[in-house]
């Protein structure tokens, strides 16, 4: 199990450091199925989760919402029929913070127990 999955988010201020190029490979090893996307110059973690139908996709979306609320760190969520795209990044620093990797790992934990996965 990923050590990130057991960690908690810390408060992220506008002057908090982004994940460094040196830290990036080690953190990505713990969430190997996530991709880095760059949108408008902002690095983001993204992963698509597939489900058997909309009901299961919506339940997963709500479960991710619950962990996001508990940690005070919120993703971009796109829920479609049979598919949820989850995107993590830290708005305040316009990039990736350790919190994003923690929440990606925790999202994987939610997905591992989610009903209706494809």
Swiss-Prot record:
<comment type="similarity">
    <text>Belongs to the pterin-4-alpha-carbinolamine dehydratase family.</text>
</comment>
<protein>
    <recommendedName>
        <fullName>Putative pterin-4-alpha-carbinolamine dehydratase</fullName>
        <ecNumber>4.2.1.96</ecNumber>
    </recommendedName>
</protein>
<dbReference type="InterPro" id="IPR036428">
    <property type="entry name" value="PCD_sf"/>
</dbReference>
<dbReference type="Pfam" id="PF01329">
    <property type="entry name" value="Pterin_4a"/>
</dbReference>
<dbReference type="GO" id="GO:0008124">
    <property type="term" value="F:4-alpha-hydroxytetrahydrobiopterin dehydratase activity"/>
</dbReference>
<dbReference type="InterPro" id="IPR001533">
    <property type="entry name" value="Pterin_deHydtase"/>
</dbReference>
<dbReference type="InterPro" id="IPR050376">
    <property type="entry name" value="Pterin-4-alpha-carb_dehyd"/>
</dbReference>
<dbReference type="GO" id="GO:0006729">
    <property type="term" value="P:tetrahydrobiopterin biosynthetic process"/>
</dbReference>
<keyword id="KW-0456">Lyase</keyword>
């Amino acid at each position: 199990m990923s050590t990130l999955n057991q960690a908690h988010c810390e408060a992220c201020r506008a002057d908090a450091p982004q994940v460094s190029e040196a830290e990036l490979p080690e953190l990505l090893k713990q969430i190997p199925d996530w991709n880095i996307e760059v949108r408008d110059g902002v690095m983001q973690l993204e992963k698509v989760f597939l489900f058997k139908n909309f009901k299961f996709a919506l339940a997963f979306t709500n479960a991710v919402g619950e962990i996001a609320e508990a940690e005070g760190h919120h993703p971009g969520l796109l829920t479609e029929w049979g598919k949820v795209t989850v995107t993590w990044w830290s708005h305040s620093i316009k990039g990736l913070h350790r919190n994003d990797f923690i929440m990606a790992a925790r999202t994987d934990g939610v997905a591992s127990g989610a009903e209706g996965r494809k």
